[in-house]
Amino acid sequence: MKNVGFIGWRGMVGSVLMDRMSQENDFENLNPVFFTTSQAGQKAPVFGGKDAGDLKSAFDIEELKKLDIIVTCQGGDYTNEVYPKLKATGWDGYWVDAASALRMKDDAIIVLDPVNQHVISEGLKKGIKTFVGGNCTVSLMLMAIGGLFEKDLVEWISVATYQAASGAGAKNMRELLSQMGLLEQAVSSELKDPASSILDIERKVTAKMRADNFPTDNFGAALGGSLIPWIDKLLPETGQTKEEWKGYAETNKILGLSDNPIPVDGLCVRIGALRCHSQAFTIKLKKDLPLEEIEQIIASHNEWVKVIPNDKEITLRELTPAKVTGTLSVPVGRLRKLAMGPEYLAAFTVGDQLLWGAAEPVRRILKQLVA
């Protein structure tokens, strides 16, 4: 049974990973060792009924060297500090990472097994030892419309994202909720009075959002009652943000198409959802296909994608973050041909940023490695 070290298991993604591994009884097939950046020597948690002893220091290279597999959700700074030191010792175990630091390295594979199991299997045969979870929007896009890529039907795709606060971290989620609460408090008495002017209410809310003391330390701007059309840093040579660049770079790496890439681009926008990312796609298909056939191709790709009929009532019920949060379901709806021509397709999808967007691909590659 393989010795598997877990780092960053207390954080948001790590906690979701622990929950999913417990639900699927994954701890039965491995010996867990838990690491910490600040509390070495304290009692380790118990998952799957296994006593893992005491917490070990996440910076102790000698302890890390003893492991067959390391799973880290600690973030890119930790990876950048520890990974090269560990590899320099000759350690030859598997490194599984939820952070972005190693994604584009030649000796790393971005994992999303319902989409790129062929790439993963080939990498394992070649002796690849580094496996990294992908960008959340990219993974959720490929889970949603992977069938179109699998059938080589996509000429190009333009994406507009509607990304949840969770993608920016736990502090950002708290800030969003604080903003929402303050906006309601600013007009709570007026909301109770049906005779109050909605324009007066709007003016008060807007003034509150613009106030110097409105909490924006994490997002840098109001998100509650607003949106932020910018995620990550600017890439000056293209005008893209790094999040937008990932759509192209990671999609093609996941699919094994880096030598013959499919153009993927668009705009990434932060909205006031808590943990589900939504995306609107404009897709140029390589050929005109009947909509019914397109729906069948999408729906049959994996067991989690679900085609939602282009009907208002069903869409409002099934195709929202409120519905999808906390589930592995990846619904795709608003499917229709666009006025630009019969080979142009519109689609809209929603997916949980912490599940298929982060923890689940990591859980599933770990399951393969311990098998």
UniProtKB/Swiss-Prot annotation:
<feature type="binding site">
    <location>
        <position position="163"/>
    </location>
    <ligand>
        <name>substrate</name>
    </ligand>
</feature>
<dbReference type="InterPro" id="IPR012280">
    <property type="entry name" value="Semialdhyde_DH_dimer_dom"/>
</dbReference>
<dbReference type="GO" id="GO:0071266">
    <property type="term" value="P:'de novo' L-methionine biosynthetic process"/>
</dbReference>
<protein>
    <recommendedName>
        <fullName>Aspartate-semialdehyde dehydrogenase</fullName>
        <ecNumber>1.2.1.11</ecNumber>
    </recommendedName>
</protein>
<dbReference type="GO" id="GO:0050661">
    <property type="term" value="F:NADP binding"/>
</dbReference>
<feature type="binding site">
    <location>
        <position position="353"/>
    </location>
    <ligand>
        <name>NADP(+)</name>
    </ligand>
</feature>
<dbReference type="GO" id="GO:0051287">
    <property type="term" value="F:NAD binding"/>
</dbReference>
<dbReference type="GO" id="GO:0019877">
    <property type="term" value="P:diaminopimelate biosynthetic process"/>
</dbReference>
<dbReference type="Pfam" id="PF02774">
    <property type="entry name" value="Semialdhyde_dhC"/>
</dbReference>
<dbReference type="Pfam" id="PF01118">
    <property type="entry name" value="Semialdhyde_dh"/>
</dbReference>
<dbReference type="GO" id="GO:0046983">
    <property type="term" value="F:protein dimerization activity"/>
</dbReference>
<comment type="pathway">
    <text>Amino-acid biosynthesis; L-methionine biosynthesis via de novo pathway; L-homoserine from L-aspartate: step 2/3.</text>
</comment>
<keyword id="KW-0791">Threonine biosynthesis</keyword>
<dbReference type="InterPro" id="IPR036291">
    <property type="entry name" value="NAD(P)-bd_dom_sf"/>
</dbReference>
<dbReference type="GO" id="GO:0004073">
    <property type="term" value="F:aspartate-semialdehyde dehydrogenase activity"/>
</dbReference>
<dbReference type="GO" id="GO:0009089">
    <property type="term" value="P:lysine biosynthetic process via diaminopimelate"/>
</dbReference>
<keyword id="KW-0457">Lysine biosynthesis</keyword>
<keyword id="KW-0521">NADP</keyword>
<comment type="similarity">
    <text>Belongs to the aspartate-semialdehyde dehydrogenase family.</text>
</comment>
<feature type="active site" description="Acyl-thioester intermediate">
    <location>
        <position position="136"/>
    </location>
</feature>
<keyword id="KW-0028">Amino-acid biosynthesis</keyword>
<feature type="active site" description="Proton acceptor">
    <location>
        <position position="277"/>
    </location>
</feature>
<feature type="binding site">
    <location>
        <position position="74"/>
    </location>
    <ligand>
        <name>NADP(+)</name>
    </ligand>
</feature>
<dbReference type="GO" id="GO:0009097">
    <property type="term" value="P:isoleucine biosynthetic process"/>
</dbReference>
<dbReference type="GO" id="GO:0009088">
    <property type="term" value="P:threonine biosynthetic process"/>
</dbReference>
<keyword id="KW-0560">Oxidoreductase</keyword>
<keyword id="KW-0486">Methionine biosynthesis</keyword>
<feature type="binding site">
    <location>
        <position position="246"/>
    </location>
    <ligand>
        <name>phosphate</name>
    </ligand>
</feature>
<comment type="function">
    <text>Catalyzes the NADPH-dependent formation of L-aspartate-semialdehyde (L-ASA) by the reductive dephosphorylation of L-aspartyl-4-phosphate.</text>
</comment>
<comment type="subunit">
    <text>Homodimer.</text>
</comment>
<feature type="binding site">
    <location>
        <begin position="10"/>
        <end position="13"/>
    </location>
    <ligand>
        <name>NADP(+)</name>
    </ligand>
</feature>
<comment type="pathway">
    <text>Amino-acid biosynthesis; L-lysine biosynthesis via DAP pathway; (S)-tetrahydrodipicolinate from L-aspartate: step 2/4.</text>
</comment>
<feature type="binding site">
    <location>
        <position position="243"/>
    </location>
    <ligand>
        <name>substrate</name>
    </ligand>
</feature>
<dbReference type="InterPro" id="IPR000534">
    <property type="entry name" value="Semialdehyde_DH_NAD-bd"/>
</dbReference>
<feature type="binding site">
    <location>
        <position position="166"/>
    </location>
    <ligand>
        <name>NADP(+)</name>
    </ligand>
</feature>
<dbReference type="InterPro" id="IPR012080">
    <property type="entry name" value="Asp_semialdehyde_DH"/>
</dbReference>
<feature type="binding site">
    <location>
        <position position="103"/>
    </location>
    <ligand>
        <name>phosphate</name>
    </ligand>
</feature>
<keyword id="KW-0220">Diaminopimelate biosynthesis</keyword>
<feature type="binding site">
    <location>
        <begin position="37"/>
        <end position="38"/>
    </location>
    <ligand>
        <name>NADP(+)</name>
    </ligand>
</feature>
<feature type="binding site">
    <location>
        <position position="270"/>
    </location>
    <ligand>
        <name>substrate</name>
    </ligand>
</feature>
<dbReference type="InterPro" id="IPR011534">
    <property type="entry name" value="Asp_ADH_gamma-type"/>
</dbReference>
<dbReference type="InterPro" id="IPR000319">
    <property type="entry name" value="Asp-semialdehyde_DH_CS"/>
</dbReference>
